[in-house]
Amino acid sequence: MRPLYETKEHVERETALAMSIEAYGTAQVNKTVKLRKMPIKYGLDFAMVVGGRVIAFAELKCRKYSYAEIDSLGGYMLDLMKITRIIEHINNTGLPVHLFVELKGEVYHAKFTDKPKFKLVFGGRNDRDDWQDNGPMGLIPMSEFKKLDIVFRDQQPVAAE
């Protein structure tokens, strides 16, 4: 079985991001939006729930790179299996999948209602000495992302200034 590399810091950042997305979403639709963590078998992080009804799915990522740095690499790199899960959820439910990415305190969002636009490359990370960290990846153009009025400081969400 493959090890999980999720650290306490990662979980804290993801939790803070989820809380801020809930607050942002609630303000946008004027209804209480809850992000409910899904079991790992679903392949995506959260179900977005309003009034007990699943209205969408969400994947949350926290990265230590800036928008410009990721853009210079050709886009946001997402494992092909994750892209496959996004497509499956869209096709099987008819619901959108939202990708939220926190980059150095700024939050970006891409909404997928169909197959995401991406360039297929072979890549990954090489800092953990795990050969399974490399494989087919989708580079999603940063032009697919919209910056949200959510700002992170010291891992705590605050309203944008």
Where are these regions (language model features)?
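Acidic-basic catalytic patches of nuclease active cores, encompassing PD-(D/E)XK
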Residues: 1-38
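Non-catalytic C-terminal interaction segments of nucleic acid-processing enzymes
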Residues: 5, 9, 20-23, 52, ...
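A structural signal for short, well-ordered beta-strand segments and their strand-loop junctions
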Residues: 57-59, 97-102
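Acidic, metal/cofactor-coordinating or nucleic-acid-engaging core segments within structured domains
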Residues: 83, 87-100, 109-112
